[in-house]
Amino acid sequence: MKFIKNNIYIEIDTNPLTFYTELGIIIRALFILNKDFTVIKIKIKIRNIRMKVVILAGGLGTRFSEESEFKPKPMIEIGEMPILWHIMKEYSYYGFNEFIICAGYKQHVIKEWFADYFLHTSDITFDFTQGNKVIIHNQHAEPWKVTVVDTGLHTMTGGRIKRIQSYVGDEPFLMTYGDGVCDVNIEKLVEFHREHRKIATLTSVLLEQDKGVLNIEEDNSVRSFREKNLKDGMPINAGYMVLEPEVFSYIKDDTTVFEKEPMERLAKEGQLMSYSHKGFWQCMDTKREKDILENLLKQGKAPWKKW
């Protein structure tokens, strides 16, 4: 059962009563009842949070052999900044500023880049006449909290998600891949997810790519999910997901590919929704696709760049 009043979403489940507000305040009220359903006790828990954003960034990027020899694919630059940064700026535009990066291959590159973030975005004076003094000018700060987690070199996508469970906790979270940008309205995506009250919602697009094929019903529920078998004009998985914490129970271990058994099972059980996006989406699996993104950025026509 769901009510919407004064921009507050009230959802009644078999567990706690949950209130969502547009500011990210979550109120959970657990009602303890008598056998006649009279209320004995009410336990209320209030959290003022925004959903955390999980970004998968541990892949090898084998199609970028020249660049990926020295860095993970999410650190390959579009313009002068890594594609990972572009993705984070997208989420930050909508007010989602706490990130969990699932690192793996050359994870130290990601950690070092964030450790030196001010060096990348500010003017620096190195004064060697006064004890190696470093002065940072016009510091450009982001409203971000970033946790980089080493989720293993050969861990599959599901395993990487499972490994960051302790950082997510028992709250819903956002998740996407570290090699694709999109101009999806993330606020509307989250609202869609809350309205349908399923465990998982993914963003789907129509594109001729080698990605997962979705069988989507008229009510936007996903009835089947097949990976790597696309025919022209069929909806595909673009990432940009909203996930409930129950999703962790669908992941067995490090060998679990999230796009295989977990998503197939979610679809079979009616727990996977599709948010249809008609706008821009582009992954970066090849040098040609990187060039597409580079050219859009140079021309000032990058649809994902809203900031």
For the regions a language model picked out, list residue spans one by one.
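Catalytic-core segments of class I nucleotidyltransferases/pyrophosphorylases
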Residues: 172-174, 181, 185-194, 206-209, ...
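Short, positively charged and aromatic/hydrophobic N-terminal segments
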Residues: 9, 18-20, 25, 32, ...
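Structural beta-sheet core signal
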Residues: 53-55, 101, 175, 200-203, ...
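Conserved beta-loop-beta/alpha segment of the NTase-like Rossmann-fold superfamily
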Residues: 110-218
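A structural signal for short hydrophobic beta-strand segments in well-ordered beta-sheet cores
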Residues: 75, 213-216, 263, 274
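N-terminal glycine-rich phosphate-binding loop and ensuing alpha1 helix
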Residues: 47-117, 148
